[in-house]
Design a protein with these regions (language model features):
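HhH-family (HhH-GPD) DNA N-glycosylase catalytic core used in base-excision repair
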Residues: 1-344
Length: 344
C-alpha cells in the first residue's frame, strides 16, 4: 500500500507513513529502505508525478461476479448515503481519527478487463487512507480466492455462478442495524426502516456528488436517541430495544464489528443482546466480520432456495445438509440468496 500511495498519489510522505500503519516517519523510512533498498523520497522522485486525485488500484482474483455484488448493493442502497451507478459504487463514510470524527466519501469503479477496482477517497480521509483501503477490500471481498471457493459452491443444488463474493461493508455497525431491522421482513421493508433512520439521524457531509449528502448515524447517536422518536419511525418496540442495546455496546467498545474481530466472542456478545438471536448474529458475522463459514441455519430464504419439504425445515437438518460446504458456507448463503432475489 505504501509503495502505491507514493507512486499513485500526491500525499506527503508523512501521511503515507501514517496510512501504512507507522507511528513515526523514521521507522517508516527504515522499513521501506530495508525492503526496497532505497528510501520513499527516492521512489517518488524517480517516478512520474501523479496527477491530482488519481485513483488507487486494488486488484482481485478473477472471476468476480460483479452483477451479483452490484445487484445486492443496489437493492439495499440508502438514499443520500450510497449510490450504485453502473460499475461504480459511491458512499459516504464516517470514521474516528485521534478521537475526532472524520467524514468523507469513497468512490469505487470496477475495471473488469484489468481485474481491478479503482478507488478514490475524499481528501478529508487522507490521514486514514490505509484503513479506508482495507475497508474497501472487505466491502467488496477483494481478497477472496475463487479457486478455493468455487469448487465447494459447485456442490450446491443450483447452477454455479463463478466468482461469488461476500458483500461486506465499510461500517460494521451499520450492517448490524440493517440486520436487526431486517428480522422477519422483506429486503424492501428493511431498507425502508433503515432509510427512515438515515432521514432522521443522518449527519450532513460535503461531497461532490449530489446523491450523497449524509453519513449513517453513529452508534453514539442511536444509543442516546429518544426511544419514542425511534419508535415513531415505524420500528416496533422490541426492535428499538435491540437497536439501542447494540448501539450502546458498540459505542462503549464492548462489541467490535469489523473484519478480524474474534468470531465466537462476537457471536456470544451479539446473542446476549435483547432481541438478537443466532440468525441475526450469524448474518452480522457474515457481512461485518467477513466470516466465510457463517451459517444462519434458521433462515427461511435458505430453506426456500433449497426446496426443502415442510418436514425438513429445521435448523438441524439444514445444517447437516450444509456440511459439505464448509468452510465456505457464507458464500453458499449469498449464492442461494441471489437465486431467491433474482428468479429466472
Amino acid at each position: 500500500l505504501a509503495k502505491q500511495l507514493l507512486t499513485d498519489t500526491q500525499q506527503p510522505v508523512t501521511q503515507v507513513a501514517l496510512a501504512a500503519g507507522f507511528a513515526s516517519l523514521r521507522r517508516f523510512n527504515a522499513a521501506f529502505a530495508e525492503r526496497y533498498r532505497f528510501n520513499p523520497t527516492q521512489l517518488r522522485r524517480e517516478g512520474a508525478a501523479p496527477p491530482p486525485g488519481q485513483a488507487l488500484r486494488l486488484a482481485y482474483r478473477p472471476p468476480y461476479d460483479m452483477d451479483a455484488v452490484l445487484g445486492f448493493f443496489a437493492r439495499r442502497q440508502l438514499l443520500r448515503v450510497e449510490q450504485v451507478d453502473g460499475l461504480t459504487l459511491r458512499r459516504t463514510l464516517a470514521l474516528q481519527h485521534k478521537g475526532q470524527a472524520v467524514s468523507g466519501w469513497v468512490e469505487c469503479c470496477f475495471v473488469p478487463e484489468r481485474h481491478e477496482v479503482h478507488v478514490q477517497a475524499s481528501p478529508t480521509l487522507s490521514p486514514l487512507l490505509g484503513e479506508v483501503m482495507q475497508r474497501v477490500r472487505h466491502w467488496l471481498d477483494l481478497d477472496a480466492d475463487p479457486a478455493l471457493i468455487d469448487p465447494v459452491l459447485a456442490k450446491l443444488p443450483v447452477p454455479l455462478r463463478p466468482g461469488t463474493r461476500l458483500p461486506g461493508t465499510l461500517d460494521g455497525f451499520e450492517v448490524a442495524v440493517r440486520v436487526i431491522l431486517g428480522q422477519q421482513v422483506t429486503v424492501q421493508a428493511a431498507r425502508t426502516l433503515v432509510q427512515r433512520l438515515v432521514d432522521r439521524f443522518g449527519v450532513p457531509v460535503d461531497t461532490p456528488f449530489p446523491a450523497l449528502t449524509h453519513t449513517f448515524p453513529s452508534a453514539q447517536t442511536l444509543a442516546t436517541a429518544d426511544p419514542e422518536v425511534v419508535g415513531k419511525l415505524g420500528i416496533v418496540r422490541q426492535r428499538v430495544k435491540a437497536l439501542q442495546a447494540l448501539a450502546t455496546a458498540v459505542a462503549a467498545g464492548q462489541i467490535a464489528l469489523h473484519r478480524g474481530a474474534p468470531v465466537e466472542a462476537t457471536l456470544d456478545a451479539l446473542r446476549a443482546l435483547p432481541g438478537v438471536g443466532d440468525w441475526t448474529a450469524q448474518v452480522v458475522a457474515l457481512r461485518a466480520l467477513a466470516w466465510p463459514d457463517a451459517w444462519p441455519a434458521s433462515d427461511i430464504g435458505l430453506m426456500n432456495a433449497l426446496g426443502l419439504a415442510k418436514d425438513q425445515r429445521d435448523a438441524r437438518h439444514i445444517t447437516t445438509l450444509a456440511e459439505p460446504w464448509r468452510p465456505w458456507r457464507a458464500y453458499a448463503v449469498i449464492r442461494l440468496w441471489h437465486d431467491l432475489e433474482n428468479p429466472t
